[in-house]
Structures are given as C-alpha cells and as structure tokens.
Amino acid sequence: MEASKCFGPRTLPIIHNVPLCLKTNFSLFPCRLLQSQSLSSKKSTKHYLFRVKAETSGDLESTRPLTYFSPSYWGDHFLSVSIDDSEFEALEKEIETVFKPKVRDMLMSPHSSDKERIRLIHLLISLGIAYYYENEIEEILHKAYGKLACLISDEDDLETIAIMFEVFRLYGHKMPCDVFERFKSEDGKFKESLVGDVRGLLQLYEAAHLGAPSEDIMDEALSFARYHLEPLAGTETSSNLFKHVENVLYRARYHSIEILVARQYISFYDQEEDQDETLLRFSKLNFNFCQMHYVKELKIVTRWWKELGIASKLPYSIRERNVETYLGGLGVLFEPRYSLARIFLAKLTLIMTVVDDTCDAYATLPEVQSLHDAFHRWDLRAMEELPRYMRIIYQSVFETVEDIDREMIARGKHGRLQLTIDEIKSLMIWYLGIAKWARSDQVPSFEDYMEIGTPSSALDDFASYGFIAMDDCDQKQLKEWFYSKPKIFHALNALFRIRNDIVTFEQEMSRGEVANGVNCYMKQHGVTKEAAVEELRKMERESYKIMIEEFMTSKAMPRQILVRPVNIARVMDLFYKEADGFGHPDQKLLQLIASLFLHPIPL
C-alpha cells in the first residue's frame, strides 16, 4: 500500500530529518490546546488598521498600509499530537488485506448491472474510498458510457439519472444535460410530483453543480431543487435524511473538499437503514488511516515553519497559517499517495504568502520593484540590492525552492522546480502591477483590473507546487501544457479573484486599497456595492461553469491532473464562503479542522 512507500524508514531523508512514525501513545486530541479554552469559546480578535511613516533607501518618504492579521490559532500544537505506529500499521494491514479486495470483488461482480455499478461508484466516492479503484472505475464507466442511450432510455427515476449524470461527468464523460427534460411538464417547468422525492431532489441539487456554460436546464434544476429542499432543512426533526439535506444546502459537495465530504457522509451513512456494513467499516478505517497520515505530514510542515521563524524576523504582521495552508493542499490532493506533494505545496504556499503579504500590505512601491527584479534574477547575490527585511524573505523563498529541488534530485527526479521558479517570476509581475495601482490610489477599469487581478490569484502557481511530486503524467508534457496557459486555470483564477474581492472589499478599502474588483465595477458603471456584487456573482458562476467544461472535455492531460484545478475551487468555499477565513479564521473553520485532524471516527 502507498503508506509503506510514503512512511518507510528511507522516506523523506532530507526534510529536516523528522521521523514520520513516532512511537508514542495513541492520542489525536491536543489537550494543551483546550486546557484553557474550548474551540467554541475563544474570543475573536479585533483587527486594527493603521499607517506608519517609513523611509526607503532612497530617502523616499512614504506611508505603509499595515494590516494586523490575527495570530495562528494552532501554532505548533500538532507537534504535541501523538500517533501510535502500531495502530497506523494495523489500519493499513486491515484495509490492504481485507477490505480492498472484498470491495473490488463487489465492484467487478459479473452479476451487477451497469446501473448498479454506477450507483456503487457514487457511494464509493461519497465515502472517500473510490481512489483505491481508479483503473476499475474508469474501465467500467468507459464501457457503460458507450451504451448510454440504452441505459437511460426507459429510466424515469430522478435519483438514478442524477447519479449517473454526476458520476459520468466527474470522470470526464459529458453526459448530455437534456436527460433531465423528461422530468419537466408541458409548461417547461420541473414536475411538481418530484417535490416528494427528497433523495431525488438532493441528488439533482448535487448534480446541477456540474453544469457547463449555456446549460440553462442545470441552473433551473439547481434553483428548483434548492427551493424545495430548503423547507426540509429548517424542519425540527431527528430525521437523518433531513439533517443531511441541511448540511448539503450549507455547503454542496462540489463546494467542499473530498475528505470533508467523506467525513460527513460517513456519519450520514452510519444511520441509514440499508447501509452496507463492509463499505461502512472500510470507509471508517480509511478515514482514520488518512487522518493519521495527515497528522504525520502536519508535524513536518509545522516543525519546518517553526524552525524557519520568519514571522519573528519581520517588522510587520503576516498570515501564519501553517495548518490552514496544509488544509488547502489537502483539499487539492487528499489521496495518501500524494504525501510529498502536500508537504511541498504547503511549504511553498506558506513562504509565498509572506511575499504576498509584503507586497500587498507593507512594502513601498520601490521595494516591490526591487523584490520583483531580484526574483527575476533568481540569484542569492540579488539580495544585496534589497532592504534588510526583504533579504530575509528572498533568502527563505530561494532556499525553500532549492531544498525541495535537492529532495527531488535525491529521488532521481531532475528539473522539477523550473516550472515553480518560472511561476514565481510571473507572479511578481502581477504583484508589481497591483502595487502600482494601490500606491497611486488608482481605480482602473474593471476590465483592466481583471487583466492583472486574475493571474495574480496565482492558483495555477498553487497547483504547480503540488505537481512537483506527482508522477501521473510525463513531466515534459505537463510543463508544455502548463506553459500554454490552459483555459481551466484562467477560469479558476477569475473565479477566485471575484470571490476574494467580494469578501475582502471592506477590509481592503479601509486600508486604502481601492483597486478591488467590486470598487472598480462600482466606479466604472456607477452602481451600488450590492449591484456590483450581484453582477460579479454571475461572473463567478460563469467562470465556474467554464472550469467544469474544460475539466470534462480537455484531453490534453489525464484526469488525475485535470481534477486538481476543480479541487482547488472546492477549497475556496472553506475559506471564502462568507468572509476572509484565511486571513481571519472563524470558529466554523477551527471546528472543521478539529473534525478532520483531531477526532477519529469511532469504529
């Protein structure tokens, strides 16, 4: 199994010599964290904005817009979380020798119909264990899609059709959306008889999130399903199904990361009358196994960040978010085999967040220009031209990239970091452009703003950090595809830029950052904030659809690569659903983190 490869005695020899398997007692709950306060009782921190005078090396007096970011809630607490090696190995053995082969037999049974297999695949996805059977699933769906017309010709069950639609599209088969026309009346509206089919409506709601541009029926399906499900979510009942409806309406499956979907679905499935005991136990074992896997990785990232100590060396506040950043990477690559990719992704994102905070909320324009020039040289000697505090940042970025490169070379993987270096250089171009607007109080047109604001979202950079340690396709082919600036990443970056600008609008305006998407749209079109946000939400939805379309139809890369941008979009809702949860994490996010990393599922 992959864990043996990821956590064997020869694994990660260069990453700070941190052993991944610690011979300690089994305890996944950090008592120190909650001795003085509970997750639900911690008081929120007020964030004060202020400006201070500063002089550059050229005697240029300027004002620095300083933002106080709340300190990390978690700090280095995960270093004290204990993992029992024997428990970890026992979980791995039971999964590998008992449940994997048993469920494979269920999936490949010659006695199952195509529809039964597709429903089983959907259940495996929901429970977070489909990744064990990627090849089998792709083979099953390839054959089934070839006879789609026959499969759906007489099918009038809404739940079955919606499940087929979701599963096929999730694996790159663009099942036509007109399949849902059969559920409409002559007046062109969805039949009222569907209102009583709660499971069908719920599945329709989930499937509608995989709609592509111009598929109006999927927008109609989303509105129809939500309208009729919302009254059920508000019902005071102990119904397991209604509680599940409430959870889904708060955060739909494709607005949540896969491991969180699995965590919540396992709890729901545990209370279902028709549960399959084999699948239920397998999913529980797998979640607990993954949780221990993740905590081991979090220890590495936390120790590295603590030893780097960059926050204490800088004269301003930065977002110290080692746990939250790791969570973001986990949302992109949750399968255990991507352990190294998650660690690299977390390290690079953390250090580049420092660069972002510096350019965004501290550095003068000449300093941003100097940092831009230094990164384009990509040479430690370039530090000589930087202010002292920027030398710390530049050296930290440079050495982090070099350390990862040495790690990959030690594994026989050469030239993996050039893509990352090129992306860092490109990102600095966008940061410089935004800094020029911000320091001049310039409000560009919305179109001009998005031309720079979209690539500055840097979610293609984020993805590239994970690609370093992935072997799902030829690296040369991956680089060529990435350098071609795929449409899927443009849509993803636009999606994030709009979402981010909406939730951070007041915060950015309060510190004088007038180049914000909402503000640019308001000024250009002479509309209120509410009207601007409404229009931007439409653009956000359209960008999401374009991303889904590209995921389903692109043949340039294998699914294991194309699904990563989609997964990044799923991460967004965790941090930017209602506010800036990355800059200022709230109680919901803290509790979510605890559920994923600190609370195993009872067996």
Curated annotation (Swiss-Prot):
Pfam families: Terpene_synth, Terpene_synth_C. GO terms for cellular component: cytoplasm. It is an enzyme of class 4 (lyase). It is found in: Cytoplasm. Binds 3 Mg(2+) or Mn(2+) ions per subunit. Belongs to the terpene synthase family. Tpsa subfamily. This is Terpenoid synthase 25. The lineage of its organism: Eukaryota, Viridiplantae, Streptophyta, Embryophyta, Tracheophyta.
